[in-house]
Design a protein with these regions (language model features):
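Short, surface-exposed amphipathic charged segments that create phosphate/polyanion-binding patches used
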Residues: 143-152
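RNase H-like, metal-dependent nuclease domains and their acidic two-metal-ion catalytic environment used
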Residues: 1-134, 140, 144, 157-166
Length: 166
C-alpha cells in the first residue's frame, strides 16, 4: 500500500485532454463496484484515472458492510452514483461515451466473465472493446508488470481514496 501511495503526484489532468489512452472495465452489479480506469502514457510514466461507480440506493448499506464510507466518496466526487440499487449500465455507457469525446480511447479491455449488453452497446457506439479473462493465466504477467511499475514509481495516480482502498 505504501508503494502505491508513493506514486501519488500533483498532476494537471487537463493536459490529458485529447490524448491517447487505454481503458480497463470491470463490471459490477449488486455487490461489487464497477470501475473504468483509463491509462495514459505521459513521458514514460503511466497516469491512471479511475471512474468508479456504485448504485446510489445501496451505498449506505454497503458502507457498513465493507467498512468504508462510500457515501462520503460519492459526496466528494471520488466515485459516481448510478440510479437504483443495481449498477445502471446506461448511466455508465453515457459516462464512457462522454469520456470518448474528451480522450482518444484506443480500446477498453473488459472482464469477459461479466460481459453484458453494455459491451454490445459500446461497440455499437464505436468503441473498441477487448475481452480479458481474470484468471491466473491472463492476470499473472500484467499483475507482475504493474507491481514493477509501482515499485519503480512509473505510475501517477490522483489519490482517489476508493482506488487506494481497492
Amino acid at each position: 500500500h505504501e508503494e502505491w501511495m508513493a506514486c501519488h503526484q500533483d498532476f494537471d489532468y487537463s493536459t490529458l485532454d485529447n490524448m491517447q489512452c487505454w481503458g480497463g472495465l470491470d463490471l459490477g452489479s449488486t455487490r461489487d463496484l464497477t470501475c473504468l480506469t483509463l491509462l495514459f502514457n505521459v513521458d514514460g510514466k503511466f497516469v491512471f484515472i479511475p471512474y468508479i461507480f456504485i448504485p446510489e440506493e445501496n451505498a449506505k448499506k454497503r458502507s457498513a458492510r465493507d467498512g468504508v464510507d462510500y457515501v462520503a466518496w460519492l459526496r466528494d466526487g471520488h466515485i459516481f452514483g448510478t440510479p437504483g440499487d443495481v449498477a445502471d449500465y446506461s448511466f455508465i455507457r453515457k459516462k464512457i461515451n462522454d469520456l470518448s469525446k474528451k480522450y482518444r480511447i484506443q480500446s477498453i479491455c473488459y472482464d469477459r466473465w461479466n460481459a453484458s449488453q453494455l459491451v454490445i452497446d459500446l461497440q455499437n457506439d464505436g468503441a473498441t472493446l477487448d475481452p480479458f479473462g481474470q484468471g491466473f493465466v491472463s492476470m499473472s504477467m500484467p499483475t507482475k508488470t504493474l507491481e514493477a511499475e509501482i515499485l519503480s514509481k512509473n505510475i501517477i495516480h490522483n489519490n482517489n481514496p476508493c482506488m487506494n482502498w481497492c
